[in-house]
Amino acid sequence: MSKTVVRKNESLDDALRRFKRSVTKAGTLQESRKREFYEKLSVKRKRKSEAARKRKKF
């Protein structure tokens, strides 16, 4: 869980920007999107294989 404390004399926009940066750096949104729905093992393997194929292609 990302936590951001608003500093003294800091605008809310700046604090929100720091929070968003910390969330993306931690990968929280990606992880929650990935776990939103159950993914069958066969589908997961297929997706992983496709990603490896794309990486190898370039």
Swiss-Prot record:
Pfam family, one: Ribosomal_S21
Annotated GO CC locations: ribonucleoprotein complex; ribosome
Similarity comment: family membership: Belongs to the bacterial ribosomal protein bS21 family.
Organism: Streptococcus pyogenes serotype M49 (strain NZ131)
GO biological process, one term: translation
Name this polypeptide is given: Small ribosomal subunit protein bS21
Keywords for the protein's UniProt record, in alphabetical order: Ribonucleoprotein, Ribosomal protein
HAMAP family, per database record: Ribosomal_bS21
InterPro entries per UniProt: Ribosomal_bS21 (IPR001911), Ribosomal_bS21_CS (IPR018278), Ribosomal_bS21_sf (IPR038380)
GO molecular function: structural constituent of ribosome
